[in-house]
Structure formats: structure tokens, C-alpha cells
């Protein structure tokens, strides 16, 4: 039993060290949580290096990683992401996304961020997206799996004004 403990600690130490290295090099790290219910991806380092809330998206890792990567690249180009407006971060013909504040206290579930930032409470925004048919999570016709997954981190905001694209 005692022999297993050092290996667990060393795994956590390596993960923490890798996170700090990536944050210093790139200004952030993307952390996938494939076994989350639902799966999700979040950032660590935006609050330190960009003075911007951390980001989280409830999506399978293969979908969530590129979504957050594009959002971070937009930040690095000077776009400030905020709750409310619609954004098209990829191309003009892509589905818009929106951000909403993560509910108070839920950031404590982002354990690696808590360890690196030395706090369980920090500002974070959830990236919200539509289902394949273009329905937002608050739309009753939205795919239930997409709608439910996105209710994990924030109170579903009111529908955006469709002419507010950035």
C-alpha cells in the first residue's frame, strides 16, 4: 500500500510541472477531462497571463479541445470574450458561440486549475454552442444531450440577439 502512494504523488507532480511549463511557454494549458460526466475541457493560465477568466466547455474532448483552442487564439489576437455577445471564432459561415459566467463555487471541480492557481474560486466562462440543427441549449427543441451537458457549469442564459455577432 505504501509503495503505491509515491507513484500517485509523482503522477500529480508531473502533471502540475507540465502545466506550469506549458503556461510559461504558451500562456495557458488546455486540460481535457474525458471521464467527466459530461466530458469537458478547460483552460489554466488565462487569468494569470491574459487577465481573462478561464474557459470551460462541456463537450467530448475531440470537440472541446479545438473549440477552446480557437477561443484562446482569438484572445491572443486581442478579442475579449464576454458573456452575452455571439462570436464566430472560426469562419463567417460557422455556427456562433456564446459565453456565460460559470456559477459561483463550481470552479472547485477544475482541480488542476485550483492547484496551479492556489484557489478553488476564480472567474471562468463557459463556452456555449448549438446542436447540429443550430438550436441553443435553452431552446426546447435542442438535442437533449447537448442541452443537458451545457447546464453543468452555468445557468442557461436568455437567448442572444441574433444580430449581435462579433
Model-based region annotation:
Residues 1-37, 47-51, 56-166:
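Acidic, proline/glycine-rich low-complexity IDRs
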Residues 38-42:
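Short amphipathic beta-strand starts and helix->beta connectors
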